[in-house]
């Protein structure tokens, strides 16, 4: 951990103790922890670093435990990313430390932060699970060290809770200003919680640039032993500039070969994209053939887990509102628990010569939860007939009756057009958790 980051978190915790901190409610995540309390499983809180995992566990959930009768000496907290607890990264030392604190038969709550910093952490967690009066919670910032291990090592005894940067509604609740100003702020700088207390533009920009290079990208490079730092750095820039557009590793490789005379193979590029996804920096949206009811492996789309980080990577240039809106909607849907794909509808149309040709129309998002499905288009506006047709044509060729929604920029309340499609403003969508059920 960087010294300035350590000092920041120390200050954050001290401020919280004084009662002066702006508390951002994260009730959805807190309720998930409460629902899973004492269920005999390891609760694994995952997500990008600095998105609020530690605050959720060590502040909000600990406060809940204390307010509901748990004694402070029955809550064992260990933050494994700090230099002051370096010795506890040794699995045997950590396990012994915890065991020594368990001195009676009452329930103990073990809170371990950034558990991937400990070698063989799976063995420690499995050992803790064998203690009857222990309830274990851990956080981690890399899915390869967590999600796969949850499945293989815990054999059904791991319960993953995914945390995202602040949604707009969470951000707005702490912003203290008007919607339009908050929306501009969010679209530029994103939803990392630390930004809430920053007062000027330069401070926010410097923070986002610094944390990307010195924390996120550095973690990816070091964990995966990447030798050529320049190549993956440029790859990140390419992905940042191409949010919402199909990504082809072979084409990227060819670009490196012709423009940089670099042998950056498509296999290496694919592996590096996987590393970025495992670190929760980006998220993959699969392409789904709606008529054929099958997935298409080629030309996947990638979105950044936070638009502020994406913008920082490009020095706050290339601020295309529609693509940024699309990224925000994608992240919002994930945070609400939907699975999200990019839809494709194949149609036969006549070209300017009157010949029938096959054409692929796109649906920005196909979202699913349980038996429910929604088709969603994201548009900056629908002010012209041409723009309306562009968004509606895909819907017209979908052979089912699931709800079809267009989200547009602005504050308009939802309404239905003559074809039954729901049109709603971004404000309504973001600030109403059940907005898709209008």
Describe the residue ranges of each PLM region.
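Interdomain motor-coupling "hinge/lid" segment immediately C-terminal to the ATP-binding subdomain
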Residues: 2-16, 141-143, 148-246, 250, ...
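Short glycine-rich substrate-engagement loop in P-loop NTPases that contacts/grips substrate
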Residues: 76-105
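Conserved catalytic/switch belt of AAA+ P-loop NTPases
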Residues: 122-138, 152
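Conserved ATPase-coupling elements of RecA-like P-loop NTPase cores
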Residues: 87-90, 116-125, 148-150
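Walker A/P-loop nucleotide-binding motif
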Residues: 40-58
């Amino acid at each position: 951990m960087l010294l300035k980051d350590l000092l920041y978190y120390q200050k954050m915790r001290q401020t919280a103790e004084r009662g002066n901190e702006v508390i951002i409610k994260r009730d959805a995540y807190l309720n998930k922890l409460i629902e899973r309390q004492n269920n005999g499983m390891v609760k694994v809180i995952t997500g990008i670093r600095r998105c609020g995992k530690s605050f959720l566990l060590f502040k909000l959930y600990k406060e809940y435990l204390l307010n509901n009768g748990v004694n402070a000496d029955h809550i064992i907290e260990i933050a494994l990313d700090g230099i002051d607890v370096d010795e506890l990264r040794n699995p045997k030392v950590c396990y012994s430390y915890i065991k020594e604190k368990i001195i009676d038969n009452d329930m103990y709550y073990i809170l371990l932060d950034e558990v991937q910093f400990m070698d063989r952490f799976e063995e420690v967690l499995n050992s803790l699970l064998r203690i009857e009066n222990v309830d274990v919670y851990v956080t981690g910032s890399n899915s390869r060290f967590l999600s796969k291990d949850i499945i293989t090592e815990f054999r059904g005894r791991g319960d993953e809770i995914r945390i995202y940067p602040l949604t707009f509604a969470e951000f707005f609740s702490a912003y203290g200003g008007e919607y339009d100003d908050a929306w501009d702020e969010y679209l530029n700088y994103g939803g990392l919680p630390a930004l809430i207390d920053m007062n000027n533009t330069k401070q926010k920009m410097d923070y986002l640039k610094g944390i990307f290079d010195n924390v996120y990208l550095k973690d990816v490079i070091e964990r995966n032993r990447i030798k050529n730092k320049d190549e993956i750095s440029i790859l990140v820039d390419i992905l940042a500039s191409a949010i919402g557009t199909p990504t082809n590793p072979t084409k990227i490789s060819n670009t490196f070969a012709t423009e940089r005379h670099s042998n950056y193979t498509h296999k290496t590029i694919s592996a590096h994209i996987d590393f970025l996804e495992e670190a929760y920096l980006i998220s993959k949206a699969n392409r789904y053939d709606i008529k054929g009811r099958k997935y298409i492996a080629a030309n996947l789309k990638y979105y950044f887990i936070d638009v502020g980080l994406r913008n920082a990577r490009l020095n706050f240039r290339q601020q295309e509102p529609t693509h940024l809106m699309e990224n925000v909607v994608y992240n919002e849907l994930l945070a609400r628990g939907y699975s999200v794909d990019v839809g494709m509808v194949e149609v036969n149309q006549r070209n300017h010569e009157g010949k029938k040709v096959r054409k692929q129309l796109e649906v920005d998002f196909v979202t699913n939860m349980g038996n429910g499905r929604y088709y969603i288009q994201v548009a900056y506006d629908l002010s012209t007939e041409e723009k309306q047709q562009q968004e509606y044509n895909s819907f017209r060729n979908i052979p089912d009756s699931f709800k079809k929604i267009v989200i547009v920029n602005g504050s308009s309340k939802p309404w239905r057009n003559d074809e039954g499609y729901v049109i709603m403003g971004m404000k309504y969508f973001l600030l109403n958790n059940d907005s898709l059920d209008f």
